[in-house]
Regions:
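The conserved Walker
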Residues: 35
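Small-molecule kinase domains that catalyze NTP-dependent phosphoryl transfer to phosphate-bearing small molecules
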Residues: 151-154, 159-210, 214-220
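Extreme N-terminal, non-catalytic leader segments
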Residues: 1-29
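Residue-level preference for the first positions of well-ordered beta-strands
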Residues: 26-28, 56, 116-118
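ATP-dependent NMP and nucleoside kinases share a basic, alpha-helical "lid"
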Residues: 68, 75-78, 85-90, 102-170, ...
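Conserved substrate/cofactor phosphate-moiety recognition/catalytic segment
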Residues: 44-108
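Conserved lysine of the Walker
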Residues: 39
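Conserved beta-strand scaffold positions in the cores of enzyme catalytic domains, especially
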Residues: 59, 145-147, 191-193
Length: 220
């Protein structure tokens, strides 16, 4: 079968009908920032707040998706070496790009179904984040994507170091650590700019919730 043999099939249930059933519009809220910046913490608080307010939401966390959707070659070893090598994703620039592409495509599908889809990934490269923005914009609309920059200084992220990754990177035990020997490209014009060193996680989550409620057509 060739790509030309594939045909897009429109659903008999439109996006508008799904949104009407949900009571709000779907969107993708993409949290990006260094490891330890607070992305997952804030995203989880946002998810809980939305759920408590009757908003249908779902969180795609970077570590969680690495256990399945974007699993590493090591995690796929039981499928055989060739399979693991072909489909497993490590942390090279190319693998990071595919990681973001897979998660972005999944997030777009969830948002199309009417869910407020929260994504918490380091996603260090600007072009990869922009590619997701473009995909969501083309499939749903430009207002359906929000880039949320979790702007926490590297020294604070290193002090927190909840997974011990910075310690390993500084000791030469871990390669391709974003912020140490792999670059992080700050967003140029994020929809929401969170300063992780200046506010509590709860305060930051409140900022995000207020913006999201306006975006999806719900009163704050």
């Amino acid at each position: 079968m060739e790509e030309t043999d594939l045909t897009w099939h429109d659903s008999s249930v439109s996006r508008e009908k799904r949104q009407q059933l949900m009571g709000h519009r779907g969107c993708v809220a993409w949290f990006t920032g260094l490891s330890g910046s607070g992305k997952s913490t804030v995203a989880n608080l946002v998810d809980a707040s939305l759920h408590a307010g009757g908003v249908h939401s779902f969180l795609l966390d970077g570590d969680n998706v690495r256990h399945g959707l974007t699993a590493s070659p090591q995690m796929l070893a039981t499928h055989g070496e060739e399979f693991a090598s072909r489909f497993g994703l490590a942390f090279s620039p190319q693998d990071r790009e595919e990681n973001i592409r897979r998660v972005g495509a999944t997030a777009e599908l969830l948002a199309s179904a009417g869910l407020v889809t929260l994504v918490a990934l380091v996603s260090p490269y600007r072009k990869d984040r922009d590619a997701v923005r473009q995909r969501v914009g083309e499939q749903i609309g430009p207002q359906a994507f929000l880039e949320i920059f979790m702007d926490t200084p590297l020294e604070i992220c290193e002090e927190r170091d909840p997974k011990g990754l910075y310690r390993k990177a500084r000791a030469g035990e871990l390669a391709r650590m974003t912020g140490i020997d792999d670059p992080y490209e700050d967003p140029l014009k994020p929809e929401i700019h969170l300063r992780g060193a200046e506010f509590s996680a709860t305060e930051l989550a409140d900022q995000v919730v207020q913006e999201l409620l306006q975006r999806i057509g719900r009163e704050p």
